[in-house]
UniProtKB/Swiss-Prot annotation:
It holds the Pfam family DUF4878. This is Uncharacterized protein aq_142.
Amino acid sequence: MRNKVLIVLAVIAGALILKSCGEPYSGAKETVGEFMEEIAEGEGRDAIKYLYPAYRDELAKNFKLPVQFTEMKPSEVLACVLSTMGRNIDEVEIKKAIAVNPNTANVVVKVEDKEGIEKFFSFTVVKEGDKWYIAKIEKYIPQVGR
C-alpha cells in the first residue's frame, strides 16, 4: 500500500513539475491574446499597455495628425486608432507560437473581419523581467515547404 501511495505521489509531483514549466512562451501567447482582445473590444488605451515602449513610441510618431488632434499625445492617438481597428474584427485565433530564445517568441495570429476576410499577423514578443511585450507586428507570410 505504501508503494502505491509513493508511486501516486511521484506521478502527481511529476505532472506538477511539467505543468509549472509549461510552454516557455505561454506568457507571450497570453500577451498577444489579451492585446487582440482589448482591440476587438475597442479598448485601445488598454491595448497599448502590451506594446513594448520603444515600439509604441515608433508607431505613435508615424501618424500624421490633423490639426484638431495636435493637442493629443501620440500614444492617445495610437489608442484611438487601435480602438477603431477593433470595430471590424470578428474573430481572433492564435495559430502558433515559436520560442526564438528564452526572452523572445514569435506568435502567429489569424484575424477574421466582419466581411469574412482572413489576415495573418506575426507578433514578435519580448520578455523584460517577468512581463512580455509586443515589440513588432508584421503581416505573416507563410514559408512554402521544401
